[in-house]
UniProtKB/Swiss-Prot annotation:
Subunit-level organization: F-type ATPases have 2 components, CF(1) - the catalytic core - and CF(0) - the membrane proton channel. CF(1) has five subunits: alpha(3), beta(3), gamma(1), delta(1), epsilon(1). CF(0) has four main subunits: a(1), b(1), b'(1) and c(9-12).
Similarity-based family: Belongs to the ATPase alpha/beta chains family.
Single GO molecular function: ATP hydrolysis activity
Organism: Prochlorococcus marinus (strain SARG / CCMP1375 / SS120)
Descriptive protein name: ATP synthase subunit beta
Function: Produces ATP from ADP in the presence of a proton gradient across the membrane. The catalytic sites are hosted primarily by the beta subunits.
SUPFAM superfamilies per the UniProt record, alphabetical: C-terminal domain of alpha and beta subunits of F1 ATP synthase (SSF47917), N-terminal domain of alpha and beta subunits of F1 ATP synthase (SSF50615), P-loop containing nucleoside triphosphate hydrolases (SSF52540)
Enzyme Commission code: 7.1.2.2
InterPro entries given in the database record: AAA+_ATPase, ATP-synt_VA_C, ATP_synth_F1_bsu, ATPase_a/bsu_AS, ATPase_alpha/beta_chains, ATPase_F1/V1/A1_a/bsu_N, ATPase_F1/V1/A1_a/bsu_N_sf, ATPase_F1/V1/A1_a/bsu_nucl-bd
Amino acid sequence: MAAAATASTGTKGVVRQVIGPVLDVEFPAGKLPKILNALRIEGKNPAGQDVALTAEVQQLLGDHRVRAVAMSGTDGLVRGMEAIDTGSAISVPVGEATLGRIFNVLGEPVDEQGPVKTKTTSPIHREAPKLTDLETKPKVFETGIKVIDLLAPYRQGGKVGLFGGAGVGKTVLIQELINNIAKEHGGVSVFGGVGERTREGNDLYEEFKESGVINADDLTQSKVALCFGQMNEPPGARMRVGLSALTMAEHFRDVNKQDVLLFVDNIFRFVQAGSEVSALLGRMPSAVGYQPTLGTDVGELQERITSTLEGSITSIQAVYVPADDLTDPAPATTFAHLDATTVLARALAAKGIYPAVDPLDSTSTMLQPSVVGDEHYRTARAVQSTLQRYKELQDIIAILGLDELSEDDRRTVDRARKIEKFLSQPFFVAEIFTGMSGKYVKLEDTIAGFNMILSGELDDLPEQAFYLVGNITEVKEKAQKISADAKK
């Protein structure tokens, strides 16, 4: 039974109309439920089938009727069935007991691991933190991943858009971030699967168990809670599951005073579900068929993701761009809320450079001298200009070869190739299939390392020494090993 139903007011209504996932319920005069209240319908239909579902009130229609959207399939639901107003919004379990578990939009566990060992629940609809409670000073969230920390740093309590096709390393990057926030920041993570494939959710769960992010033997040692409303679910579930995941994250931030990572995969599906619900409720569509409340819907979710004086929720959101059209209202509205973008490039993955984060396409509002400091800013811009020059020279190299370049350009190419290799690093969660121990690289080590490459101090070291290492000390050790092996 849904957690929301535990606070039942007992006001009973009758289902009068069912159109797909939308139902109209009639209540006694003066006892209408509030908008966003959860209604619970349980019982047997005339055919003897068990029916149990929760719906959320969306509209008050007049004539003592409300219109609600179901959070699960309405198969078997018939007119005349009894609906109970729970008196509150949908509520989900929160706290440490959620770690290592998989929930649906209603906070019910769906992983066959038994009931959740907590009585603490929280409603999924809440106000965003007050302005006076916010942490206003921008602070960089160190991930320990060189390419991100140097070129597109994340803001603590900020929102990051994650762009990338299939098979370029999104899942491994997500796992590494979850691992690093747990080990280095003492934080936890919440994963919200919004309208994506069930198979992907299952694969992710199995990979989390393999990499130790979820400890199957002792769930209390797990570092992530998962909340799924996948492609096969009704639009109501897909529209609200992001809020369910966010509510779990808010508890860790506000009550446990922790730094939290919230992953949303995929934020576009949240908008898409809102569009479907809007049409079902009979609202006039807006541009490209989206809901007229698009900006409000996205804003209500995004404004709750922030840093407070107590803790922070840093959100990483996979963004699907329909037909690669960045001007589509859904991605365009999302972009307005993002502080950074991390773009994964197939060309880098093909070269074996992991993480395959594109150093030229990825951006961050944090990369400015007033926030990260002059040295970090100068180093990042020098790295980008070196890589950009290398990109411009690639056509000439392909046609005429390296020998036709000027001395300066040859030096630039040599350093750019070392930079490109040095942007790769071994991940902790990938140890099981690379056989290499993972590396967490401190920001100061990252900056110092790239400065040494740019200054020419390391021009005499072989390019291969920079590949899949942590800091510059490891580069030098690897170079000595390569040199020793060559002499044998």
